[in-house]
Amino acid sequence: MIDKIKIRGARVHNLKNVNVGVPLNTITAIAGVSGSGKSSLALGVLYAEGSRRYLEALSTYTRRRMTQAAKAQVDEVLYVPAALALHQRPGVPGIRSTFGTGTELLNSLRLMFSRLASHRCPNGHYVPPTLAVAAEQQLTCPECGARFWPPGAEELAFNSQGACRTCDGTGLVRNVDLATLVPDESLTIDEGAVAPWNTLMWSLMTDVCRAMGVRTNVPFRDLTPEEKEIVYHGPAEKKHIFYKAKSSNQAGELDFTYYNAVYTVQNALAKVKDEKGMKRVEKFLKQETCPDCGGSRLSDAARAPRLRGIGLDEACRMTLTELTGWVNGVPGTLPPEMRPMAASICESFQTAAKRLMDLGLGYLTLDRASSTLSTGERQRMQLARAVRNRTTGVLYVLDEPSIGLHPSNIVGLTGVMHDLVADGNSVVLVDHDTQILKEAGWLIEMGPEAGAKGGQVIAEGTIAEIMQNKNSKIGPFLKAESSVIRKQATAEEMFDAGRIHLETGAIHTVKPLAVDIPKGRLTVVTGVSGSGKTTLILESLVPGLTAATSGQKLPEHVLNVQADGIRSVKLIDATPIGINVRSTVATYANVHDELRKIFARTEDAKTLGFKAGDFSYNTGKLRCPTCDGTGVINLDVQFLPDVEIPCPDCRGSRYDKDAAKVKYPAANGQYCSLPDLMDMDISTALTACADLKTVRQRLQVLKDLGLGYLTLGEETPSLSGGEAQRLKLASEMGKSQSDAVFIFDEPTIGLHPLDVRTLLDVFQRLIDSGATVIVIEHDLDVIRNADYIIDMGPGGGNKGGTVVACGTPAQIKAAPASVTGKFI
């Protein structure tokens, strides 16, 4: 009986000829410090080989139309099933995607409204539910005798025939924002008070406006309401004006039609042909809910069918939990002959909905735009879609499924994983969360360190065996809850350095709130998924503080922000740095420019005639001509995926062989070239550059941030979310930050419990330099180390959106209403 996948000689990324067995039909966890090779083993070997072999069974013609993974660098992988991967960061969907379309729940709901609802005849009467709809027959109205075709499921889709004609199925319209048309009312119209006339229209519109009876030589605020109405909405009348050009002394008479300020913007919007033109216009626009469909995206005809007294638009506005209860009652309201069909449609809806509710997404409404969902919510949608089909014999590879999950939601996630195994599948997950790791039947730990010092299996076995293994780094964290490692402020001294006060109106699911955040402290915002953490901090506090510090108008829903002494807001999120391979750790950390100058001053460079600019791998003379300084070349192979290989000439160094002739006497006694330095990790380069003050200081900051394992030449787009966040912080360390607020969005993504301790040290150093640090987080180690906690909830969606408790970790633990408190 084959009971495990056998991997022999895996060399993907930093894996060092790894030989390991991965048990089938169980949950296998892969743990290890950041950069130790976990994802390389799970995604780079298991998923790459599992999906590639499945696709190779298809015809060449079919494969041509699919993106394919290249063959993994491994000697052999035996007994690997067809594989599906759920990536750490699902792509952000477009404007047309909603929670309903993304989960495909809307398909079942549209079918329900098409087949089971009461349909409206052309004269406005409703026909009782009938099987004639499913039989694709015309309906006859019992009141007026009109015959008509009922709408099919496709005619109820807002991305198809059921789209609202006004907003084209997006639920949003762009309208002119009157507040932007005259930004400074102290100016006269002659001085350019009406902004769109300055940028989108001929300057002579001022003369036409004068001919309309508006005084153009007094401050705009002093105009009468009638005059202002003419400026904003005046009629398109033709006026005879005397016009004098500003640039010359030429003058003349002409007839010209008046374009009011609003029409000027509308006219310019209609004529936009490119992005540049759109940029000129969009500053005068604001997005608003469509007045015709009320944001439901559906046409009047698509909103017409009635089931249990409501339309499709109203059903989509319910939360998933409410909607499930409503769907349960549908068959009972129909004639007996329709109930078997109704039960079948409703069951398909309930099966899909149950998975999503198990994963803690019951608070979301079907009409919620997918682009407003958090990473964790999108990942759980992806997981629910993958497990819905009750397949067997599939390998599911999950990359950090605990991202964005509150400890209380993890129970539902582990339940889904056990269901997959019960159906005869195998689950491999990469994670750091000890709560999830404890659910695994087998654990493989990678290490011992990160980067070049990692890539080996340092421990494997059951959870009990790992706990006893002296080589294991995760073992101690599986055994016991980790302790508090920083000195926390007491409740009495919490606000000694001052406070930031925020008041907001209702937005999304968040009710009107008033919160105080202590300055110079570590504040952690907690709460179950969907409780309003992101809305409170990223959509209210960040734009509110930014507006307050720059003297701009507060966003509409932000009622009040008081932040005395705060001058800058720094959002450190996990978005990748750069989009192309030309951005490296050395260029981003401002080390590369310094190194180029140093190498240009060497005797070798002077002899060969090289200047600092020549050492640039992007534009310099010394860049490799074969790969143009990227270090890789793409091979376009017909019928196969593009193959990206290290450049055969420079072997990935990005430099021509002449660059190796310029040597610098390093502090460790060796002579090294710039390509040699770029190939070193930060810790090694620190030793080599010990006598270069500026370079040493910048590299030391990166090492202190726990990034010593990254090589200087590593591409920044390939860094994990946690690495990207810490690299962005590098330029902020060491400065006085008493006027700064740092906001982190789940910074522990991808961090091992040991790395979380490094992160807490980083927070402490920022606080020691005077900064206020605010963190949105689910990680219990970070929560336990907070000075102040703002716990949102109590539930998600409509059941959340309020502040349940505020205070020290001890006060939150004692708060009966706090779900987070139960886990501290």
Q: Where are the model-predicted features located?
A:
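Conserved phosphate-binding elements of NTP-dependent enzyme cores
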Residues: 1-824
